[in-house]
Amino acid sequence: MKSRIPVVLLACGSFNPITNMHLRMFEVARDHLHQTGMYQVIQGIISPVNDTYGKKDLAASHHRVAMARLALQTSDWIRVDPWESEQAQWMETVKVLRHHHSKLLRSPPQMEGPDHGKALFSTPAAVPELKLLCGADVLKTFQTPNLWKDAHIQEIVEKFGLVCVGRVGHDPKGYIAESPILRMHQHNIHLAKEPVQNEISATYIRRALGQGQSVKYLIPDAVITYIKDHGLYTKGSTWKGKSTQSTEGKTS
């Protein structure tokens, strides 16, 4: 049996709050990579953005990290990493990728088999490939003037790679065709299709909560309880960041 390439998926974003759509992205991406026969996804990482991101209605990072941890209680392969949220200032996506790549070089995680319980090999694990996981809406932002640095896009798709999950109203193949950098490295961009259209947005969740509407079955129950216990996303609870930074590479 040919050895598969181990992969770690990293998603950067606000996770304000984390939703079932965020979690589904990981599952869809993992299935897609496994079905290629080339890759074995061994870990997923959720990296909530720093408080200085400056986005309206952004809950404090310790709340967003806590909610992500609660949402991931039932996952045996995805974890939340607070490093980005704990930095002194907002971090560009490529810098977050560099940090986690450096960690993987120092201490690669154990590679598990398709049943998520048994190691594929008894030999020392190869250093996994780190790929940025995003929705097609983020891929579209690569075209937005002055939002991404070309050098950063180049590094992301050349050194790391992308796994892009499709969304309604977006044409990821078209976005790639329109970008010289993306076209050059399209072999390192994986387009995963979500068979069940899932358009849950954190923006909608916040609006619904602010209006006292139910969000059950849209976000995990444990997250709903946390939001209620801490009075988040209600009228008058808005937390604003300290600066207005670029929205580069971030998911709501």
From Swiss-Prot:
NAD(+) binds at residues 14-15, 90, 93, 135, 137, 147-148, 167, 198. The keyword NAD applies. Pathway: Cofactor biosynthesis; NAD(+) biosynthesis; NAD(+) from nicotinamide D-ribonucleotide: step 1/1; Cofactor biosynthesis; NAD(+) biosynthesis; deamido-NAD(+) from nicotinate D-ribonucleotide: step 1/1. InterPro entries: Cyt_trans-like (IPR004821), Euk_NMN_adenylyltrnsfrase (IPR051182), NadD/NMNAT (IPR005248), NMNAT_euk (IPR045094), Rossmann-like_a/b/a_fold (IPR014729). Homotetramer. It catalyses: beta-nicotinamide D-ribonucleotide + ATP + H(+) = diphosphate + NAD(+); nicotinate beta-D-ribonucleotide + ATP + H(+) = deamido-NAD(+) + diphosphate. Keywords: ATP-binding, Magnesium, Mitochondrion, NAD, Nucleotide-binding, Nucleotidyltransferase, Pyridine nucleotide biosynthesis, Transferase. It holds the Pfam family CTP_transf_like. Transmembrane segments: none annotated. It is an enzyme of class 2 (transferase). One of its GO terms (molecular function) is nicotinamide-nucleotide adenylyltransferase activity. The gene is NMNAT3. It is found in: Mitochondrion. Expressed in lung and spleen with lower levels in placenta and kidney. It comes from Homo sapiens (Human). Its EC number is 2.7.7.18, 2.7.7.1. Belongs to the eukaryotic NMN adenylyltransferase family. Activity is strongly inhibited by galotannin. Inhibited by P1-(adenosine-5')-P4-(nicotinic-acid-riboside-5')-tetraphosphate (Nap4AD). One of its GO terms (cellular component) is axon. This is Nicotinamide/nicotinic acid mononucleotide adenylyltransferase 3. ATP binds at residues 22, 56, 140, 203-206. One of its GO terms (biological process) is NAD biosynthetic process. It comes from the Eukaryota. Its main location: mitochondrion. SUPFAM superfamilies: Nucleotidylyl transferase. Divalent metal cations. Mg(2+) confers the highest activity.
